[in-house]
Amino acid sequence: MNAIQPPVKPPSPPKDPQPPGPDGRAPSKLVNSERDPDARWTKKGGKRYFGYKAHVGIDQGSAIIRRNKMTDASVNDTVPADELISGDEKAVYADQAYDKHERRAGLVARSIKPRLMFRPNKHHALTERQKRFNDAVGRRRAPVEQVFARLKGIYGMARARYLGLARNQTHLRLLCLAMNIKRWAVLPPAEVTA
């Protein structure tokens, strides 16, 4: 997951109380933008961001991007996680945001090794073994963080160029395609066994 800011200035929270929404619940204090109705607020590392999140699934050996998805920033990372799994992987490496018991069980049922970092909670601290496991998984996850660094630093995805989720999703897919083409050009040719 990586937060991407929209091309417009984020709206400020409203000063007046608002009536309940159509579902009867109180409206969010952080309103949506009138110019970009698909963008939403999120909080990451103590900072608030308004915009979108990019999610990618890559091949561990070649660093080829296999799946990608753009969501609004309010979507939890666990929601699009299953869409990033192609199904033919031997193992899935992911950070703590993707850790769910159902996901681990689903991966095992599909004969995929779940290498998801363990998440501590207020009732149970991580054991030393789980901490070592998280360190090992963190080292294997480095290629996906490099993809995000390239998307933001070289391709300018730190800020969304377009208004709307669909246009930004298309832009993300085109950038991933460009990155894959550049990556394929430097990969060694696959050995053919007869």
Could you describe each region identified by the protein language model?
Residues M1-A109:
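Polybasic low-complexity intrinsically disordered regions
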Residues P10-P14, T127-D135:
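Short, surface-exposed amphipathic charged segments that create phosphate/polyanion-binding patches used
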Residues H55-G57, R67, Y93, R115, ...:
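Structured core elements
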Residues T71, P120-K122:
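Short, solvent-exposed coil/turn elements at secondary-structure transition points
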Residues V79, E102, H123-Q130:
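Short, charged, surface-exposed secondary-structure boundary motifs
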Residues Q96, F118-R119, Q146:
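Short secondary-structure boundary segments
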Residues H101, A105, R110-S111, Q130-A194:
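Basic, amphipathic alpha-helical segments enriched in Lys/Arg and hydrophobic/aromatic residues
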Residues R110-F118:
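Short hydrophobic/aromatic-enriched beta-strand-loop microsegments
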